[in-house]
Design a protein with these regions (language model features):
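Membrane-interfacial helix-loop segments of redox and metal-homeostasis proteins
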Residues: 1-347
Length: 347
């Protein structure tokens, strides 16, 4: 029975991956930064800046895709009776690990999702990120096998699970109303100034959120499941994203293979690898990549909501203290922070 179910799920997961890859390329066509149709880390970073939690003027914009991801997941979970508020599993640990995951992502300049999209755009620097990401996941799996756990979560009242989606609706209202206390990157002032129209971004987020909720897509979970159980279906979804985005980039002329001159990327292979090693390691301990955490938060999981707040805090720390990389390369502060993060996760 389980094998039959898996056979039915796999084509759907692959189909969802193809659609998500197409949507990611379309978002670039409609205005998002190159190789950044979707990037959970970057979009959370931009939103954090827009809300005033960091002062990096080049990366400040409330990204509707994030709102859409959460609401798309929430709506489908409610429709399929999978909205099940839970939480209380090591919230402080999740917050701190989330911070370090973001610091690792901003060393690499992208989350696991963007890593795939960078590869699809011909950015060979992402190969080093992928190698580090795999190493980090293997390290996390090692600790899981040794018995590491953040302990069980507990059933909560529906209102608890609904708080995070409601917060996202509030953030969307702030984007549309654009009050003076919300910060936006000026035209041509950096990646924050490049974005698709609000409606297009929101619809894209809703679609991807719903698909990710239904398929349980997770880059970290996909690789973890291959290592632990020999189960490929989740990973096939991300391979489908890679292939469809690659084809889309070639059709639209966005495929530019090479190392130098890649958009919002640097060529330091060592720190690309170490940044994603930190991200992969932390995500295994958390039980999912940043995309999966947003989807779970939309389903009412307050542990994942805490993790998302940790990711946003990590973005604020990274930009306020000079930890984030730029196209010119990593910073000394960022290098130190990544090493500290790896040590903290190991300990």
């Amino acid at each position: 029975m389980k094998e039959t179910l898996s056979k039915k799920e796999t084509p759907f997961i692959i189909g969802a991956g193809i659609i998500i890859g197409i949507i990611a390329v379309a978002l670039v066509y409609f205005g998002n930064p190159a190789n950044m149709g979707f990037c959970i880390a970057c979009f959370l970073r931009d939103t954090t800046g827009a809300l005033g939690f960091h002062s990096a003027a080049a990366v400040q914009y409330i990204r509707p895709e994030i709102v859409g991801l959460v609401l798309g997941s929430c709506i489908l979970a409610l429709a399929t009776k999978e909205f099940k508020p839970r939480g209380g599993s090591a919230p402080v640990s999740r917050f701190v690990i989330g911070m370090f995951v973001m610091i690792g992502c901003l060393m690499f300049l992208g989350c696991p999702f963007r890593m795939i999209l960078r590869l699809a755009g011909g950015d060979f620097n992402a190969i080093f990120g992928l190698i580090g990401f795999l190493a980090g996941i293997l390290a996390g799996v090692f600790f899981l096998k040794k018995g590491y756990t953040l302990k069980r979560s507990y059933k909560m009242q529906p209102v608890e699970g609904g708080i995070f989606p409601i917060v996202e609706i509030g953030i969307l209202v702030l984007l549309i109303a654009a009050p003076a206390f919300i910060h936006f990157t000026e035209a041509d002032g950096g990646p924050g100034a490049k974005h698709a129209a609000i409606a297009i971004s929101l619809i894209a987020g809703l679609l991807v959120g719903a698909l990710a909720q239904r398929t349980r897509l997770c880059m970290v979970g996909g690789i973890r499941d291959v290592v632990l159980f020999g189960e490929w279906k989740l990973l096939l979804g991300f391979i489908a994203i890679l292939v469809s985005a690659l084809i889309g980039n070639m059709i639209l002329g966005y495929f530019t293979p090479g190392f130098v001159g890649q958009p919002i990327a640097h060529t330091d292979g060592l720190w690309n690898a170490l940044g994603m090693a930190l991200a992969g390691f932390g995500c295994v301990l958390l039980g999912g990549c940043p995309l999966r955490q947003l989807v779970l938060a939309g389903e009412g999981n307050t542990d994942s909501a805490i993790t998302v707040f940790g990711l946003m805090a990590g973005a604020a720390v990274a930009h306020n203290f000079g930890l984030a990389s730029s196209g010119e390369g990593p910073t000394a502060n960022g290098n130190i922070a990544v090493v500290i993060g790896l040590v903290v996760l190991i300990v």
